[in-house]
Amino acid sequence: MEVAAGGGCGAGPPLLLSDSEQQCYSELFARCAGAASGGPGPGPPEATRVAPGTATAAAGPVADLFRASQLPPETLHQITELCGAKRVGYFGPTQFYVALKLIAAAQAGLPVRTESIKCELPLPRFVMSKNDGEIRFGNPAELHGPKVQIPYLTTEKNSFKRMDNEDKQETQSPTMSPLASPPSSPPHYQRVSLSHGYSKLRSGTEQMHPAPYERQPIGQPEGPSSEGPGAKPFRRQASLIRSFSVEREPQENNSNYPDEPWRITEEQREYYVNQFRSLQPDPSSFISGSVAKNFFTKSKLSIPELSYIWELSDADCDGALTLSEFCAAFHLIVARKNGYPLPEGLPPTLQPEYLQAAFPKSKWECAIFDSYSESMPANQQSCDLNRMEKTSVKDVADFPVPTQDVTTADDKQALKSTVNESLPKDVSEDTATSKDYNSLKARPRSRSYSSTSIEEAMKRGEDPPTPPPRPQKTHSRASSLDLNKVFLPSAPAANSGLLPPPPALPPRPCPTQSEPVSEADLHSQLNRAPSQAAESSPTKMDAPHAQPPSKPIRRKFRPENQTTESQEPAAAVGGAVSAAMVKPHPTVQKQSSKQKKAIQTAIRKNKEANAVLARLNSELQQQLKEVHQERIALENQLEQLRPVTVL
């Protein structure tokens, strides 16, 4: 006896089922539908039926069942489209039966078409390994006993409600029998742990015994069923797309995620926040597009996928990512790396409002600002010179400053005046840099950020970190007034009383004239420093600033013919000075080691950026090649479609 299925559904082609096909397909459908409803109710298997229009098959078990058919992924995608499940977004009984028919046709060697299911076909075979053997879904009468008749099928969907209290997460779902159908209206949507996963399909022999289901479909409704009928097909379709990306979904990663892969756990949140902090220390600030691009490109996802993730996560479309937007983008990338296809829209659990409510600011301050507790809001930052002096010193000087070696009051006065002269230029440059940086964005953001966040983000993300500042010989600004060089003691100056410096400097005034040096003379030497930058080393340039006034003049008088004469007054005058200059010498060596480390870091960053750009170049070249081939194919088709002119 043959029964027509799907006559009035319109979701798939009309289908004729024999008795054996009815029983086999209904049992498989009941098994897959039971996972979606949390398991059937108690009762003997023989008394249960698949109620029409009350159940839909879960996407996860259906995907595992179809993979057990050992058909290529392309064929499975074609079957999913032909049966109508991809169009309606879920597997009803009609779509499921048509898909099984198409699988049987493909296994029989027939083309995957709707015409192939009209002829008589053997039952589909689903092969898996158990105890190093093969088990097939063979004759259902031998495996399952009495037959079950199915009435005509409809495409009504069952409404699922979800438990609101998420602490009641169960570790095991109720058992089910092979012929049992799910209850017509389940009380809630069971959240089942995926610790073991539905890694293999149970065989027909295993179906004789009730077994717990531990696989849960991914794309169930995110809220109560009162959302309205319009929201269901979208989410079911997203679930279907996720489940049937078999060619890109590693099966071994299925157990790494809970039943809601788009919900960020506490451990993941801490990791994402730490990554954000490495790019931007201020969590109330944001990461620019170029910094995020360089960071996310290291995931080795394709450029179209990264672009799509950016479109989903950048909720306000301003070309930058806040902390919540960064966490959403990072979570999408991690999910994609673990085999989950990207959703068609940003899931509710990744919306910025949800993440901000889930991760309050107090937690951020406690967990993240342990080493950044000195930062304060922008509305409390004053723009006076003393506050900006501290900021500039923090930005420019990356190493301890030997201020304890400055002994005279004249030197302190000169250093203070030098700092006051150089600071307005640095502050103006920082302001101009922040203005240029803000002008590059699509539209301005009203977020507050500290005075150092932009510069540190540019150093860490957009460009490789640069070594400590060096003398700019051709720069129009007085580079000798840089704070680093103000506090740097010179290496030759430490041994000024013992070894003569190189005799390359021009003759200078006699040492006897250098004892009473006024503050005006010191300022005149500071003004002459830029002109001497081309012929003197950085350590020699810094000598007039970091040492007593008498020492630079005495050191400069070193002609070749008067070297021995100059050593005697130098030893007499520099006796007290050499004791003060012994301590800064290890600091200079320490600075050189820091410079080497900074250079090595810059080289490593440049190599990483070069590798990223090289891979990006290869991907773009491949895309260009594919587009070129597509163009040639279209031109050939156009030539064939043109009318032939007969002369």
From Swiss-Prot:
It comes from the Eukaryota. Gene3D superfamilies: EF-hand. Tyrosine-phosphorylated upon stimulation of cells with EGF. Phosphorylation on Tyr-residues induces its association with the EGF receptor probably indirectly through an adapter like GRB2. Residues 499-510 have a biased composition (Pro residues). Ca(2+) binds at residues 314, 316, 318, 325. The modification Phosphoserine is found at residues 239, 480. InterPro entries: EF-hand-dom_pair, EF_Hand_1_Ca_BS, EF_hand_dom, EH_dom. Residues 301-336 form the EF-hand domain. Residues 501-647 are annotated as: Interaction with RALBP1. Residues 524-539 have a biased composition (Polar residues). Residues 599-640 form a coiled coil. The keyword Cytoplasm applies. It is found in: Cytoplasm. Residues 21-122, 268-359 form the EH domain. Residues 221-230 have a biased composition (Low complexity). The modification Phosphothreonine is found at residue 466. GO terms for molecular function: calcium ion binding. Transmembrane segments: none annotated. Signal peptide: none annotated. The keyword Calcium applies. Residues 158-170 have a biased composition (Basic and acidic residues). Its main location: cytoplasm. It holds the Pfam family EH. Interacts with EPN1. Interacts with EPS15 AND EPS15L1. Interacts with RALBP1; can form a ternary complex with activated Ral (RALA or RALB). Interacts with ASAP1; the interaction is direct and this complex can bind paxillin. Also forms a ternary complex with RALBP1 and ASAP1. Interacts with GRB2. Involved in ligand-dependent receptor mediated endocytosis of the EGF and insulin receptors as part of the Ral signaling pathway. By controlling growth factor receptors endocytosis may regulate cell survival. Through ASAP1 may regulate cell adhesion and migration. This is RalBP1-associated Eps domain-containing protein 2. It comes from Mus musculus. The lineage of its organism: Eukaryota, Metazoa, Chordata, Craniata, Vertebrata.
